[in-house]
Amino acid sequence: MDARNKYSIPKGYSTTSLILRSLRYFRRNTVKGITMNMEKFGDTYSAVFPGNRLIIITQDLSFIQHTLRDNHTNYHKSKFMVDKIGKMFGNGLLFSSGSYWLQQRRLIQPGFHMKKLQGLYSIVVERVEASLAAFPVGEAVNIYPPIHQLAFSIILRSLFDIDLPRETMQEISALFNSMQEFVIKDMNRPLRHLTYIFTNQDKVNIRRRDRMRAIMHDIIEQRRKDPHTYNDLLDMLLNARYEDTGEPMSDDQIIDEVLVLMLAGHETTANTLCWLLSMVAKEPQVMERLRVVAETTDIYDSVKNDYINAVINESMRLRPAAFMTDRMALADDGVGQWAYPKNTVILSFFYGVHRSKDHWENPDIFMPERFLDGAGKLRKMPAFFPFGAGPRLCIGNNFAMAEMCFFVHAFFRRCTISSTGQEPIMKPLITLRPDKVLLNVRRRL
């Protein structure tokens, strides 16, 4: 029986109409495609993908809170997303579910407590200062490459605390980019797999995945032979022991978690910082206030600075790196007027709820002050999901915020920027990446 007849399913696209009409927007820009559909159907709509897969896309706050927090035990990561992304990046925390996810989360969580992370702060600050000392200046500078390289070097050094050869870093970066591009095209074009018999694209990408894992395995092997103790995330993963057995993770499990940390740990921060600079470049008052903060406070105190945090939050509100997330219902469920069967995939569209007039005043305007109370202290906002929500809240959120605070403090102490008038183009991959960010950059120091 058609689920639309038995349940209360939001209006949306059938398989045929999805392919013929909606899909052309997804191929160009997933965020714009979903936004256009929200304008047509409202805050929640549905789509039936090939294979009779029912997907509900929502930017309704109560719906998002229900699936991610209030009734989270009824939801796992969707098989569709795990098959597509997990096939490339492994079964780490970002893609696993159920008892295995909980086991891994409990095992790894202690390594991300604030006191543990503070031991990595000096690594982050050293990398930030070195990068900004050589930061490109001039007219219409594309700031994405140096910031992406910085974020990548920070996560690699935090993971491994060794200087990897430049060629290895470049190879890892190229592999990640190619793997992401492949996965997103696969998800946005449901019939694309039919072309593989002619193109062998899937086999090419599997070879990329295998090469990536081989590089990680070599690094782990070298570390096991090294008698020194390192204050890095790899040592934490190698030394972690399961409570019930006292056993360590296997190399494959460690590689899964390393790949997830690399994927989430550099893409999200690099993207957010680039979006942030592109917005602040058009707001001289915000830039001046950041300069004053940077010149009158210590960089290590920036983590607790309310204004710096507010600027970062506002950037993540307007351009959330994690612009949506998925869950699959394990049993029939419903929210408000909607009811849907088990195996329904729910896509929580953070980008949309972050710009909803129901929750934000002047939602399309860059206003960091909205995150401050009357006393200038940082406040929490209910319709704000920069790192997800519920038990699966990003495990590295504190590390990411610290890294971004250090960068913002150091950047505006050293540099000033202005807009070129060219808006960055959104490039939604696994994260929301800017295609290019062209700014006029001048050095203060």
Per-region residue spans from a language model:
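Conserved cytochrome P450 K-helix E-x-x-R motif and the immediately C-terminal K′/meander segment
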Residues: 21-42, 214, 218, 299-336, ...
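Conserved cytochrome P450 catalytic core segment spanning the I/J/K helices
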Residues: 22, 45, 86, 113-115, ...
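Cytochrome P450 catalytic-domain helical core, especially the substrate-recognition surface
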Residues: 2-39, 53, 61-65, 70-72, ...
